[in-house]
Protein backbone atom coordinates (compact mmCIF):
# COMPACT_ATOMS: atom_id res chain seq x y z
CA UNK A 1 0.00 0.00 0.00
CA UNK A 2 1.32 3.43 -0.97
CA UNK A 3 1.87 5.96 1.74
CA UNK A 4 -0.03 9.24 1.38
CA UNK A 5 2.00 12.29 0.42
CA UNK A 6 3.39 14.14 3.46
CA UNK A 7 1.20 17.16 2.71
CA UNK A 8 -2.12 15.23 2.63
CA UNK A 9 -3.29 17.03 5.76
CA UNK A 10 -3.10 20.41 3.98
CA UNK A 11 -5.95 19.55 1.59
CA UNK A 12 -8.75 19.83 4.20
CA UNK A 13 -7.26 23.13 5.45
CA UNK A 14 -7.08 24.53 1.92
CA UNK A 15 -10.69 23.47 1.26
CA UNK A 16 -11.80 25.14 4.51
CA UNK A 17 -9.94 28.37 3.64
CA UNK A 18 -11.51 28.42 0.17
CA UNK A 19 -14.99 27.84 1.60
CA UNK A 20 -14.55 30.67 4.11
CA UNK A 21 -13.31 33.02 1.39
CA UNK A 22 -16.31 32.25 -0.81
CA UNK A 23 -18.75 32.79 2.05
CA UNK A 24 -17.23 36.18 2.91
CA UNK A 25 -17.22 37.54 -0.67
CA UNK A 26 -20.68 38.82 -1.62
CA UNK A 27 -22.06 37.51 -4.86
CA UNK A 28 -22.03 40.03 -7.69
CA UNK A 29 -24.97 38.19 -9.22
CA UNK A 30 -27.02 38.88 -6.10
CA UNK A 31 -26.35 42.60 -6.57
CA UNK A 32 -24.22 42.75 -3.44
CA UNK A 33 -21.05 44.46 -4.51
CA UNK A 34 -18.63 45.28 -1.72
CA UNK A 35 -19.02 48.91 -0.66
CA UNK A 36 -15.97 51.12 -0.62
CA UNK A 37 -14.80 52.29 2.78
CA UNK A 38 -16.79 55.28 3.98
CA UNK A 39 -14.92 58.51 3.39
CA UNK A 40 -15.24 61.58 5.48
CA UNK A 41 -15.88 64.93 3.88
CA UNK A 42 -13.11 65.83 1.46
CA UNK A 43 -10.38 68.11 2.69
CA UNK A 44 -9.15 70.95 0.55
CA UNK A 45 -6.32 73.35 -0.01
CA UNK A 46 -6.76 76.91 1.31
CA UNK A 47 -4.93 80.03 0.23
CA UNK A 48 -4.60 82.79 2.82
CA UNK A 49 -7.33 84.75 1.03
CA UNK A 50 -9.74 81.80 1.02
CA UNK A 51 -9.13 81.03 4.68
CA UNK A 52 -9.80 84.68 5.58
CA UNK A 53 -13.40 84.25 4.34
CA UNK A 54 -14.07 81.92 7.30
CA UNK A 55 -13.14 84.33 10.09
CA UNK A 56 -16.44 84.16 11.94
CA UNK A 57 -17.56 87.59 10.78
CA UNK A 58 -20.33 86.17 8.57
CA UNK A 59 -23.17 84.51 10.51
CA UNK A 60 -23.98 81.95 7.82
CA UNK A 61 -20.36 80.86 7.22
CA UNK A 62 -18.44 78.16 9.09
CA UNK A 63 -15.50 79.33 11.20
CA UNK A 64 -12.08 77.96 10.25
CA UNK A 65 -8.66 78.46 11.72
CA UNK A 66 -5.32 76.90 10.94
CA UNK A 67 -2.58 75.71 13.25
CA UNK A 68 0.64 74.30 11.79
CA UNK A 69 -0.93 74.52 8.34
CA UNK A 70 -3.87 72.28 9.24
CA UNK A 71 -7.29 73.93 8.81
CA UNK A 72 -9.88 73.09 11.46
CA UNK A 73 -13.63 73.77 11.46
CA UNK A 74 -14.12 75.43 14.86
CA UNK A 75 -17.74 76.43 14.23
CA UNK A 76 -18.85 74.26 17.17
CA UNK A 77 -16.76 76.57 19.36
CA UNK A 78 -18.50 79.69 18.07
CA UNK A 79 -18.60 81.13 21.60
CA UNK A 80 -14.77 81.14 21.52
CA UNK A 81 -14.03 81.90 17.85
CA UNK A 82 -17.12 83.71 16.49
CA UNK A 83 -17.57 87.44 15.99
CA UNK A 84 -16.77 89.32 19.21
CA UNK A 85 -15.63 86.12 20.96
CA UNK A 86 -12.39 86.04 22.97
CA UNK A 87 -10.35 84.07 20.39
CA UNK A 88 -11.90 85.46 17.21
CA UNK A 89 -8.53 86.99 16.31
CA UNK A 90 -7.23 83.44 15.64
CA UNK A 91 -9.99 82.63 13.14
CA UNK A 92 -9.62 82.91 9.38
CA UNK A 93 -5.86 82.51 9.35
CA UNK A 94 -2.95 80.29 10.34
CA UNK A 95 -2.19 81.59 13.84
CA UNK A 96 0.45 79.03 14.82
CA UNK A 97 2.75 81.61 16.40
CA UNK A 98 -0.07 83.12 18.47
CA UNK A 99 -1.16 79.67 19.65
CA UNK A 100 2.43 78.77 20.61
CA UNK A 101 2.93 82.00 22.54
CA UNK A 102 -0.66 82.08 23.83
CA UNK A 103 -0.84 85.57 22.39
CA UNK A 104 -3.53 87.52 20.57
CA UNK A 105 -1.11 90.30 19.64
CA UNK A 106 -1.67 90.99 15.91
CA UNK A 107 2.08 90.60 15.29
CA UNK A 108 1.85 87.00 16.58
CA UNK A 109 -1.16 86.00 14.47
CA UNK A 110 0.93 84.36 11.76
CA UNK A 111 2.04 80.97 10.51
CA UNK A 112 5.70 81.90 11.09
CA UNK A 113 7.09 79.92 14.02
CA UNK A 114 10.74 80.81 13.45
CA UNK A 115 12.50 82.04 16.57
CA UNK A 116 10.12 80.35 19.02
CA UNK A 117 11.66 78.85 22.14
CA UNK A 118 11.67 75.09 22.76
CA UNK A 119 9.00 75.64 25.41
CA UNK A 120 6.78 77.56 22.97
CA UNK A 121 7.21 74.87 20.30
CA UNK A 122 6.28 72.23 22.86
CA UNK A 123 3.20 74.25 23.82
CA UNK A 124 2.25 74.52 20.14
CA UNK A 125 2.47 70.74 19.65
CA UNK A 126 0.55 70.12 22.86
CA UNK A 127 -2.32 72.50 21.99
CA UNK A 128 -2.36 71.27 18.39
CA UNK A 129 -2.83 67.64 19.51
CA UNK A 130 -4.85 67.97 22.69
CA UNK A 131 -7.15 70.82 21.69
CA UNK A 132 -7.52 71.22 17.96
CA UNK A 133 -7.00 67.67 16.69
CA UNK A 134 -8.97 66.25 19.62
CA UNK A 135 -11.98 68.59 19.33
CA UNK A 136 -12.37 69.88 15.80
CA UNK A 137 -12.61 68.25 12.36
CA UNK A 138 -9.85 68.85 9.85
CA UNK A 139 -11.25 70.44 6.70
CA UNK A 140 -8.05 71.12 4.81
CA UNK A 141 -4.52 72.39 4.69
CA UNK A 142 -2.99 75.74 3.95
CA UNK A 143 -1.25 76.05 0.61
CA UNK A 144 1.88 76.95 2.55
CA UNK A 145 1.90 73.51 4.23
CA UNK A 146 1.55 71.57 0.98
CA UNK A 147 3.54 73.79 -1.39
CA UNK A 148 6.99 75.31 -1.18
CA UNK A 149 7.47 79.06 -1.69
CA UNK A 150 8.23 78.45 -5.39
CA UNK A 151 4.95 76.54 -5.86
CA UNK A 152 6.54 73.11 -6.09
CA UNK A 153 5.06 70.30 -3.96
CA UNK A 154 6.40 69.96 -0.43
CA UNK A 155 7.77 66.41 -0.47
CA UNK A 156 7.75 66.31 3.34
CA UNK A 157 3.97 66.89 3.50
CA UNK A 158 2.09 64.28 5.52
CA UNK A 159 -1.66 64.64 6.13
CA UNK A 160 -2.86 64.77 9.73
CA UNK A 161 -5.36 61.97 10.45
CA UNK A 162 -6.80 62.12 6.97
CA UNK A 163 -6.23 58.77 5.26
CA UNK A 164 -8.61 59.83 2.49
CA UNK A 165 -6.67 62.96 1.60
CA UNK A 166 -5.19 62.75 -1.88
CA UNK A 167 -3.03 65.69 -2.86
CA UNK A 168 -3.68 65.07 -6.56
CA UNK A 169 -7.33 65.99 -5.90
CA UNK A 170 -6.10 69.52 -5.23
CA UNK A 171 -4.30 70.07 -8.55
Swiss-Prot record:
The keyword Transmembrane does not apply. Residues 151-171 are annotated as: Disordered. It is found in: Secreted, Extracellular space; Mitochondrion; Endoplasmic reticulum. It comes from the Eukaryota. GO terms for cellular component: endomembrane system; endoplasmic reticulum; extracellular space; membrane; mitochondrion. Residues 157-171 have a biased composition (Basic and acidic residues). SMART domains: Cyt-b5. The modification N6-acetyllysine is found at residue 135. Keywords: Acetylation, Endoplasmic reticulum, Heme, Iron, Metal-binding, Mitochondrion, Secreted, Signal. GO terms for molecular function: growth factor activity; metal ion binding. PANTHER family: MEMBRANE-ASSOCIATED PROGESTERONE RECEPTOR COMPONENT-RELATED, NEUDESIN. Belongs to the cytochrome b5 family. MAPR subfamily. Acts as a neurotrophic factor in postnatal mature neurons enhancing neuronal survival. Promotes cell proliferation and neurogenesis in undifferentiated neural progenitor cells at the embryonic stage and inhibits differentiation of astrocytes. Its neurotrophic activity is exerted via MAPK1/ERK2, MAPK3/ERK1 and AKT1/AKT pathways. Neurotrophic activity is enhanced by binding to heme. Also acts as an anorexigenic neurotrophic factor that contributes to energy balance. This is Neudesin.
Amino acid sequence: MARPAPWWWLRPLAALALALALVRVPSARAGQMPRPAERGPPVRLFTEEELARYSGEEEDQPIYLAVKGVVFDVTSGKEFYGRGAPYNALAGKDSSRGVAKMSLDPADLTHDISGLTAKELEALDDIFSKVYKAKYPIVGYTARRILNEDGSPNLDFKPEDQPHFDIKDEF
